[in-house]
Amino acid sequence: MNSAFQPISAVIICKNEVRSIRSVLRALKGHVDEIVVVDSGSTDGTLDVVRSEGLEPVFHAFEGYGKQKQFACSLATNLWVLSVDADEVISPELGQELQEFQGSSTITAYRITRRFRFLGRTFKHGHGASDLPIRLFRTDYCRFDDAEVHESVKVEGEIGLVDGEMLHESYVDLAQYLEKFNRYTSIAAEQIVNSGKSRSVVLTGLMIPFYFLKNYVVWGNILNGTHGFIWSVLSSFYPFVKVAKAWALRKQ
């Protein structure tokens, strides 16, 4: 371990995240040495909130999640970067760890436990209730890939795990869910078209009941009550909608 604490830059990309961005920023304050916010054209008051928290957002046209996050990392002035989504709130325990972070001579990236929250309820059961994304890393050994969606960090070196957690407040209401659902399925549809692969709209549509059973029963969301049921129903339509959008794009 190093003898001195390592300075950390938190980097956030956002667009129209007025519902959650303030709590994200306030949770970070006092625990990291720098906060970088990259916005791709918010129109809902997000920029006003960021500025009211004493930060100046940087505009960068959206090129996909991987490239956008890598651009944000390039603005960081510290070697260690904490990548935080605009709907992720770090816990006080994680904040304390970040303040006392000393780094490692061999570990270049750390995973952080992320708890999933949907419509005000933290899921405690089933697939997706929590995951371990790489969120803290050295920018000289790690970088985001160029994926348009479902981006990941490429790591050179060992990967560790920190004890603290972050809360993924993905969808505070159904309007926000549907907004993101529409955005993600549109990106996924473009990827399908660009890949040249053909998928049956009819077959994918007929699979919706099976996707629901997998989400609700096999993956254990039945244990998350009504919230788990709603999540399972909505998620079951994702494959069909992205394939249907790809079909529509090809017809244009």
Task: Write out the residue ranges for each language-model feature.
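N-proximal low-complexity "stem/linker" segments adjacent to membrane-targeting elements
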Residues: 1-27
